[in-house]
Amino acid sequence: MHAEEKLTAETFPAAPERNATLEGKNKFLGFWLFLGGETVLFASLFATYLALKDKTNGGPSAEELFQMPVVFMATMLLLTSSLTSVYAIYHMKNFDFKKMQLWFGITVLLGAGFLGLEIYEFNEYVHEGHKFTTSAFASAFYTLVGTHGSHVAFGLLWILTLMIRNAKRGLNLYNAPKFYVASLYWHFIDVVWVFIFTVVYLMGMVG
């Protein structure tokens, strides 16, 4: 079946990511290799943070600094966005392009809300004198959490680009795997944040 062939809900494959074009399958493999590299990157950042988290240089500790209500709200937004992306892929596999776009749109809004809260959080810390150069702890914290934030921004841009570029095309075997891969990437970002929330924030609050 070619990407250009007219598809219907009856002929659209249940797992379009497995019925992609050869080019799409190669990109799918490349994505998993990319994700492996991303995992190594974040593992190294976590290791660095754990090694430096007590090096406050007389500045505030994690327990004194973190604003948990803001962090909790941001966490809920990001976790909910993971659920909405699941709904988007569900509708994609049922060949309902409009509902897929709707749920991806909600995912983008939730992700943007998460980023907004993270920027607010960083701004508050800076105003309290907790800057990147304040201590080794501060540098490790901003590097880890900021790197994740940049990945969230990239994921939002990726999903938005797919939504806009394919708004008039609808679903086919060429673009369906792209939406699927973008959703997988978004789940990866969410999983990384769960580790950040646990290791950085929760463990930081208990000392």
Curated annotation (Swiss-Prot):
Primary localization: membrane
Assigned keywords, A-Z: Cell membrane, Membrane, Translocase, Transmembrane, Transmembrane helix
GO terms under biological process: aerobic electron transport chain
PROSITE patterns: COX3 (PS50253)
InterPro entries the record matches: Cyt_c/ubiquinol_Oxase_su3 (IPR024791), Cyt_c_oxidase-like_su3 (IPR000298), Cyt_c_oxidase_su3-like_sf (IPR035973), Cyt_c_oxidase_su3_a-hlx (IPR013833), Ubiquinol_oxase_su3_dom (IPR033946)
SUPFAM superfamilies on file: Cytochrome c oxidase subunit III-like (SSF81452)
Enzyme class, broadest EC rank: translocase
Molecular function in Gene Ontology: cytochrome-c oxidase activity
Pfam families assigned to the protein according to its UniProt record, in alphabetical order: COX3
Catalytic activity, EC: 7.1.1.9
Transmembrane segments: 28-48, 70-90, 102-122, 144-164, 186-206
Compartments in which it is found: Cell membrane
PANTHER family: CYTOCHROME C OXIDASE SUBUNIT 3, CYTOCHROME C OXIDASE SUBUNIT III
Protein name: Cytochrome c oxidase subunit 3
